[in-house]
Amino acid sequence: MRIFRPWRLRCPALHLPSLSVFPLRWKLPSLTTDKTMCKSVTTDEWKKVFYEKMEEAKPADSWDLIIDPNLKHNVLSPGWKQYVELHASGRFHCSWCWHTWQSPHLVILFHMFLDRAQRAGSVRMRVFKQLCYECGSARLDESSMLEENIEGLVDNLITSLREQCYGERGGQYRIHVASRQDNRRHRGEFCEACQEGIVHWKPSEKLLEEEATTYTFSRAPSPTKPQDETGSGWNFCSIPWCLFWATVLLLIIYLQLSFRSSV
């Protein structure tokens, strides 16, 4: 007796080739770096801003900017210098679940080298990723940074480059608003930089110095004001005032007791 199998029927007018059956595997991308990272950090915008500003800062030297997703923190070849931007602001877009979020804790790593004999230098750059806390996968969206944000970050890079490679002093770093602490908790378990041991959600040293200077100037007494005038205000916590308020309280209690006894 033959068994009827409808899936073996073939139409003489239309024959579709058989498809090989393969198992479906659900796998979440890990924090390992891949080549897609190079295309997601708007390489052309970074190079455009960097080349324009370096042409103004050092027109006699030739510099190149390379996106290197395999760059390691504190792992430097001889002659190379390092600069880390700890508090950049960027927008992440998850290509898996389409979740989008803004992060003020974006970490960018730079390695710099200058060949003085050839008058040529090279900068390698890596933008650390963050995992999506909705599904566990994320990549940096191409429209993650505005042009003015990139310009500020490049200014800081060039300031560090001139200090470390050229021995110049007197540069000023731009302290981004994102470097200030906010109410949002940074999730280190989803951050690629945190997983590699880069602590960056705390205020940077530049920010702490700025706040300490502001605090010192704002709290320092005025030099034109005499010393005896600084304590001439009304101090309601002094001993005479404490005795006065105690007397008033006892008087109120005495009046209340007298009123109750009369009733």
Swiss-Prot record:
Signal peptide: none annotated. PANTHER family: RECEPTOR TRANSPORTING PROTEIN (PTHR14402), RECEPTOR-TRANSPORTING PROTEIN 1 (PTHR14402:SF19). Residues 1-238 are cytoplasmic. Specifically promotes functional cell surface expression of olfactory receptors, but not of other GPCRs. It is found in: Cell membrane. The keyword Transit peptide does not apply. GO terms for biological process: detection of chemical stimulus involved in sensory perception of bitter taste; protein insertion into membrane; protein targeting to membrane. The keyword Membrane applies. InterPro entries: R-trans_p, ZAR1/RTP1-5-like_Znf-3CxxC. The chain crosses the membrane at residues 239-259. Interacts with olfactory receptors. This is Receptor-transporting protein 1. Belongs to the TMEM7 family. The gene is RTP1. It comes from Macaca fascicularis (Crab-eating macaque). Residues 260-263 are extracellular. The lineage of its organism: Eukaryota, Metazoa, Chordata, Craniata, Vertebrata. GO terms for molecular function: olfactory receptor binding; zinc ion binding. GO terms for cellular component: cell surface; plasma membrane. Pfam families: Zn_ribbon_3CxxC (PF13695). It is a single-pass type III membrane protein. Its main location: membrane. A zinc finger (3CxxC-type) spans 88-197.
